[in-house]
């Protein structure tokens, strides 16, 4: 499976400009799956009056519900402007795309990450469980309540967003289903040593792959160094099959990291059966 991590320099709160760059990165990656950072089209903004999107139930889900005499639309994927644009790009370029966006809810909004497939389906949709109180996210966003796992290529995947990475119990709760964790982030350079250590730790303790995709460059007074990467089940940082730098890169760290991986998680867990020895405390 070819998966690409798009380490982008997000243009602050400019959805149209960032959407154009998303398409550039998708074209350049030439991968089955391209993943973008948290809040991909706006940056980590608390200005929900600018970033939040009013959403409707996903058309396919709604259509199926209308044929059901007792439809249950609770916790079903919804779609707003960003997701509709990404559906178009996914179809146009025959690529599965992971994108971060903000859903308007009352009284607080939700920080979402969605996986959109080439056929226009929302394969996975996750609301960040742990708002980052140190950065005042909790004052503008409510925490999600549901774990999110689903199929991503040849892997069963689990989603988490940025600050969630500091809570190992969330990841353990998605095992043994999850074979790869996707962690989009806006993680500043000042704490990047934590980012790298925690990505490796989540891989080791759950014996699975972990893909951390971070932004880069200067945004709203913060500097982001990127340091995106794919970690193997033994915690090692994998060497990309290739790195791609766009000619119009906005900073020196902006690039695509492309990996070719096979699902060997079951084999690894069987050979060194740590998870089966765990006791509930």
Residue ranges and their predicted role:
Residues 1-5:
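Extreme N-terminal starter segment of soluble prokaryotic enzymes
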Residues 7-12:
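Short polar catalytic/cofactor-binding loops
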Residues 15, 23-118, 125, 189-208:
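Cys-nucleophile CN-hydrolase/nitrilase-fold catalytic domain and related Cys-dependent amidase chemistry
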Residues 81-98, 166-253:
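CN hydrolase (nitrilase-like) catalytic-core segments centered on the catalytic cysteine
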Residues 104-176, 190-197, 258, 267-277, ...:
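Active-site catalytic loop in hydrolytic enzyme cores
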Residues 129-132, 244-252, 261-264:
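A short acidic/small-residue loop/turn micro-motif
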């Amino acid at each position: 499976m070819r998966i690409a991590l798009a380490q982008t320099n997000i243009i602050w709160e400019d959805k149209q400009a960032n959407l154009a760059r998303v398409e550039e990165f998708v074209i350049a990656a030439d991968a089955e799956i391209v993943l973008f950072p948290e809040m991909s089209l706006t940056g980590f903004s608390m200005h929900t009056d600018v970033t939040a999107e009013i959403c409707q139930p996903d058309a396919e889900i709604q259509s199926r519900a209308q044929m059901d005499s007792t439809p249950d639309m609770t916790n079903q994927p919804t779609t707003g402007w960003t997701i509709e644009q990404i559906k178009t790009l996914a179809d146009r370029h025959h690529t599965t795309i992971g994108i971060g966006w903000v859903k308007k809810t009352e009284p607080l909004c939700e920080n979402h990450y969605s996986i959109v497939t080439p056929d226009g389906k929302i394969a996975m949709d996750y609301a960040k469980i742990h708002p980052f109180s140190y950065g005042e996210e909790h004052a503008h966003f409510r925490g999600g309540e549901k774990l999110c796992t689903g199929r991503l290529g040849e892997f069963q995947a689990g989603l988490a967003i940025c600050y969630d990475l500091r809570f190992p119990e969330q990841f353990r709760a998605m095992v043994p289903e999850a074979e790869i964790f996707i962690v989009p982030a806006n993680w500043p350079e000042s704490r990047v040593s934590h980012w790298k250590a925690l990505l490796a730790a989540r891989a080791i303790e759950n014996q699975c792959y972990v893909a951390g995709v971070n932004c880069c460059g200067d945004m709203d007074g913060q500097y982001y160094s990127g340091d995106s990467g794919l970690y193997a089940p033994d915690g090692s940082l994998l060497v990309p099959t290739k790195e791609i730098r766009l000619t119009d890169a906005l900073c020196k760290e902006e690039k695509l990291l492309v990996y070719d991986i096979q699902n060997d998680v079951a084999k690894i867990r069987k050979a060194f059966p740590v998870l089966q020895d765990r006791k509930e405390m």
